Amino acid sequence: MEDTTQWLSDASTAIHISLVSPSESGLQHVATFNPRHTYSIFGDDEKIFGYQDLKVNLRYRANDMRPHLNISYSKKSGTINELEPTDVAAILDEGNHLPKIAFAKARDFEESSKQLSDDWTPPGKLHTTFDSPEGQYEIWCGNLADPAVKQLNSRLQIFVPLFIEGGTYIGQDPDEDSAELDLSDADRWTFFSLYQKRKVGDKTAYVFVGYSTIYRFYYFQPPTPPASPQSDEWELPNGNMDLGELPCRTRLSQFIILPPFQGKGNGARLYKTIFEHYHKIPQTYEFTVEDPNEAFDDLRDICDLQFLRKMPEFNNLLVDTNIKIPKKGFLPKLIIGSSLLEEIRLRAKIAPRQFGRVLEMHLMSKLPVSVRPTMAIEDQPAATKADQHEAKVWGLIVKQRLYRHNKEVLSQIEPAERVEKLDDTLHGVGLEYARILAAVDRSDKYEGQTTASSKRKLDADEITEDLSNKKARVEDA
């Protein structure tokens, strides 16, 4: 059997994604980067067979994100051990990973860039603008039922499997092999896109930075007794009900900041903008996140804690150091202000488990330095009995949540082993919280260095031109 190693290419290395910005002198390079994951497209081994010096160049026009695919190589194999060379273009086309326009000729891609008008704006409506050390940014918001927003999503959706672990496309059924996408509920999807405005020559150009998609679920409220009828007359409700007025649970589904723009606070700005937007909407009862990975969990924890700390009622929550911990039986309330916890959570519109974790972080940050978990290697001051008692109460608060979350597994092991496992988990949780709290401190210091005018909501009288009436150009795909 012939050795095929020389004909194997690592898909994550072979694929080069680049942003190019249109200018009078042609397309200017903005950034190039590689994907993180390719297994959902090219298999678990993330290999492409049949080529040497393979380069899969996926260029994006940095403003409207029109893609262009170009594949090059020095040698292509024949059939080896009954293996045919991987048809990369066919996989990307037939799997609906890229729109048809991505497979057009390079000349068409370059010529169409010259035809873009100087007053081009992203699809949707301008939602927020803010300044940062890297320049001016804009966040645009639209509905997936809008053809221009739908087109942008079809161009960007390949980033989901390439950068989100286990990510799937909107409308994709993960249990089906079909590549067809069902967008019948497009009107429930909201699309937030983040752009940087850059100077290209003597003109200003948009450069795409990242995006997030949001889905609305109906929020089932606890049943309440119906009001007593005022008369014997009864009529069916009007059928012209606005579904947007119904109570909903808002779920953040996809969230991507392209690699060249990471580590600059862009993810936090986008997340906070989205969260604050939905928090102000009366119909939103809860804001949730779909299967967050570890990196996004950190971002979410930092932003949620900063948001909650702006609520005086949350800041007043403290570990109750005056309680006595019984050796047996039920534990007393461990938090001063515990009767307000659910009220605060509902006002914040944060999901129960997330609220519990962030509350634990906040309470830990108030522990005496002598007993507060830390990543630092410096010696801590000696702990008093009062310090140790406060730390023990905080530990019980965390263990209560851990036990509830893992009750089924923990109930199957012996009590002594159960206590040991909870203690080990508590130690790990403390170190994790210490890492996140350190990031919160860094973020607070960074935000303190920016001026209050770095971000502003757009008021009607600030807009000299009605951008919402400007139609974004929709190409063939």
Curated annotation (Swiss-Prot):
Component of the HAT-B complex composed of at least HAT1 and HAT2. The HAT-B complex binds to histone H4 tail. One of its GO terms (molecular function) is histone acetyltransferase activity. GO terms for cellular component: chromosome, telomeric region; cytoplasm; nucleus. The active site is at residue 290. Residues 44-46, 215-217 are annotated as: Interaction with histone H4 N-terminus. It comes from Gibberella zeae (strain ATCC MYA-4620 / CBS 123657 / FGSC 9075 / NRRL 31084 / PH-1). Residues 444-477 are annotated as: Disordered. It catalyses: L-lysyl-[protein] + acetyl-CoA = N(6)-acetyl-L-lysyl-[protein] + CoA + H(+). Coiled coil: none annotated. Acetyl-CoA binds at residues 255-257, 262-268. PANTHER family: HISTONE ACETYLTRANSFERASE TYPE B CATALYTIC SUBUNIT. Its EC number is 2.3.1.48. One of its GO terms (biological process) is subtelomeric heterochromatin formation. This is Histone acetyltransferase type B catalytic subunit. Keywords: Acyltransferase, Chromatin regulator, Cytoplasm, DNA damage, DNA repair, Nucleus, Transferase. It is found in: Cytoplasm; Nucleus. Belongs to the HAT1 family. Gene3D superfamilies: 1.10.10.390, 3.40.630.30, Histone acetyl transferase 1 (HAT1), N-terminal domain. It comes from the Eukaryota. The record marks 189 as: Interaction with histone H4 N-terminus. Catalytic component of the histone acetylase B (HAT-B) complex. Has intrinsic substrate specificity that modifies lysine in recognition sequence GXGKXG. Involved in DNA double-strand break repair. Residues 467-477 have a biased composition (Basic and acidic residues). Signal peptide: none annotated. It is an enzyme of class 2 (transferase).
